[in-house]
Amino acid sequence: MLDLKFIRKHPEAVRMALEKRGAEFDLDRLLDLDDEWRQKLFTVERLKNRRNAVSEEIARLKKAGEPAEELIAEMRNVSQQIRELDGEIRQVEENLQALLLQVPNIPHPLVPFGRADTDNEEVRRWGEPPAFGFEPRPHWELGEELNILDFARGGKVSGARFSFCRGAGARLERALICFMLDLHVDRHGYTELFPPFLVNAQSMTGTGQLPKFAADMYKVENEDYYLVPTAEVPVTNYLRDEILDGDTLPRKYAAYSACFRAEAGAAGRDTRGLIRQHQFNKVELVKFTRPEDSEDELEKLVRDAEEVLRLLRLPYRVVLLCTGDLGFSSSRTYDLEVWMPGQGVYREISSCSNFTDFQARRANIRYRAHPRAKADFVHTLNGSGLAVGRTLAAVLENFQQADGTVTVPEVLRPYMGGMERITRK
């Protein structure tokens, strides 16, 4: 959430940011409501001052034995006006808050202008796409022939965009989760959390999923519960409504969770394979930092996610998202895209974002630089470290062999009981 004082003071900067994003939002309506709210507050304060003055005058007249009926009548009238205005102020505040929750974050000055993902800027590449002496196949074909992915039974049990991992496929999924968590905890210094998979609406609002993306979420009927779309939600809200000791920053958390997304806008896209499922696993990295450190911490976050791909020997590229492709809550985002030879494209496997104080304002997460300092909002960051299903798909496609088997990356073999090759069983 943006600071209302900032919007009030810099309306044209906010308007320009909305235009760069291609966001449709009635900023004038918000500014008008803000004016109305402040005018009503001024009026009610003036009435309260008058009520206090009349009350003192009534007390003086009564003490002197003089009549005070006219002032008592005025007192009743003023009190009634205050009650009515207080109700109007509450309604205006609710409407104003609802609008504030719909304003996206301000893009960082380094974010390139653009309307779609085709305008994103490539920053760097790592690794060479493997050269095959045969036509590489997509992971869904490899997985089904090796009997380690079962999309048909996933559809039977749950519906479209669900699947089973089986045998070595299930073990590979588990190996990837453990490998990622061990790397981030042991080498990168994150504290591991295992979060709830159900959160309340306040948590979803705190990270920016609600109210804007309600259609993409799975809600438990007649309950204040949502299935998490990412561990970012519970882990960020882990510190909601808290004031942190500045000496403990940055705080870094790594968490595995299953993720659940309705994919309401994805009809017809990526209908095969593991790329766009309603349920998938992900290891998430979340940071809480001082404002002056957040940009440096973003670069470190990207490097932490990159190391997963490098250790797996998976070719990838890093792209800086343009204004039109930037997430609602993000100020700046890097995407990591892994090479998928069976599809001949780079596919997103991680998004690493700096949200500045946008989420912290919504979730009321603050810190004190020293014990007597004023509490200020932290900056929050998060990134996928990585999306597990997409990583599994990338391993199958990049390590496939001419005979249809798949070589297990060396760093995963200790997690696979020493298995070096996945064959059909």
From Swiss-Prot:
It catalyses: tRNA(Ser) + L-serine + ATP = L-seryl-tRNA(Ser) + AMP + diphosphate + H(+); tRNA(Sec) + L-serine + ATP = L-seryl-tRNA(Sec) + AMP + diphosphate + H(+). GO terms for molecular function: ATP binding; catalytic activity, acting on a protein; serine-tRNA ligase activity; transferase activity. One of its GO terms (cellular component) is cytoplasm. One of its GO terms (biological process) is seryl-tRNA aminoacylation. CDD domains: SerRS_core. L-serine binds at T230, A231, E232, E284, S384. Gene3D superfamilies: Bira Bifunctional Protein, Domain 2 (3.30.930.10), Serine-tRNA synthetase, tRNA binding domain (1.10.287.40). InterPro entries: aa-tRNA-synt_IIb, aa-tRNA-synth_II, aa-tRNA-synth_II/BPL/LPL, Ser-tRNA-ligase_type_1, Ser-tRNA-synth_1_N, SerRS_1_N_sf, SerRS_core, tRNA-bd_arm. Homodimer. The tRNA molecule binds across the dimer. Consists of two distinct domains, a catalytic core and a N-terminal extension that is involved in tRNA binding. HAMAP family: Ser_tRNA_synth_type1 (MF_00176). Catalyzes the attachment of serine to tRNA(Ser). Is also able to aminoacylate tRNA(Sec) with serine, to form the misacylated tRNA L-seryl-tRNA(Sec), which will be further converted into selenocysteinyl-tRNA(Sec). This is Serine--tRNA ligase. It comes from Desulforudis audaxviator (strain MP104C). The gene is serS.
